[in-house]
């Protein structure tokens, strides 16, 4: 969905925008919100992933659902639209453990997958707000590269 200056990204989706646009996603529990930003070109992308690895999936039709494949897809799209791989900065938010006693540990596995994939691609993660047990909404500012994290009970934070 596009508002005059904010693009909203749903679960298993991503968007890329140039300054001064903002990109927003909500409902980050065990899911991850991952931003990539090229500070020189003022281009940024936001990805909302659900699951850690595409290799474990029966349906592989949407790479943005998966942390590993989604990051690779977003990096490729950022480069295709003028970003430089050596200039990309990443921020990672979410990966909460929303349910006690969950043996699936989706949040933890998403965080691990993001870190491993970024390392493999040579992209630096410059900030994180991950884990814990609460949901988050993020608003990414492509003018500054700032990421506003909103929570219901924990307040707002800028990374």
Swiss-Prot record:
InterPro entries per record: CheD-like_sf (IPR038592), Chemorcpt_Glu_NH3ase_CheD (IPR005659), Cytotoxic_necrot_fac-like_cat (IPR011324)
Record SUPFAM superfamilies: CNF1/YfiH-like putative cysteine hydrolases
EC number(s) stated in the UniProt entry for this protein: 3.5.1.44
Gene Ontology MF annotations: protein-glutamine glutaminase activity
Catalytic reaction list: L-glutaminyl-[protein] + H2O = L-glutamyl-[protein] + NH4(+)
Keywords assigned: Chemotaxis, Hydrolase
Broadest EC class assigned to this enzyme: hydrolase
Signal peptide per UniProt: none
Domain of life (superkingdom): Archaea
Single GO BP term: chemotaxis
Function recorded in the entry: Probably deamidates glutamine residues to glutamate on methyl-accepting chemotaxis receptors (MCPs), playing an important role in chemotaxis.
Similarity comment: family membership: Belongs to the CheD family.
Identification of the protein by name: Probable chemoreceptor glutamine deamidase CheD 2
UniProt organism field: Methanosarcina mazei (strain ATCC BAA-159 / DSM 3647 / Goe1 / Go1 / JCM 11833 / OCM 88) (Methanosarcina frisia)
């Amino acid at each position: 969905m596009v508002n005059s200056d904010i693009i909203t990204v749903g679960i298993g989706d991503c968007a890329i925008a140039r300054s001064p646009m903002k990109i927003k996603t909500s409902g980050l529990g065990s899911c991850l919100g991952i931003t990539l930003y090229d500070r020189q070109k003022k281009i940024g992308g936001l990805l909302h992933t659900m699951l850690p690895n595409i290799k474990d999936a029966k349906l592989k039709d949407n790479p943005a659902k998966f942390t590993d494949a989604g990051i690779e897809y977003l990096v490729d799209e950022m480069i295709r639209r003028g970003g430089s791989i050596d200039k990309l900065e990443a921020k990672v938010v979410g990966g909460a453990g929303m349910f006690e006693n969950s043996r699936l540990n989706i949040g933890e596995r998403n965080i691990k997958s993001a870190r491993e994939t970024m390392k493999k691609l040579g992209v630096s993660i410059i900030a994180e707000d991950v884990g814990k047990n609460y949901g988050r909404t993020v608003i990414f500012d492509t003018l500054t590269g700032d990421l506003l994290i909103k929570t219901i009970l924990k307040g707002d934070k800028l990374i």
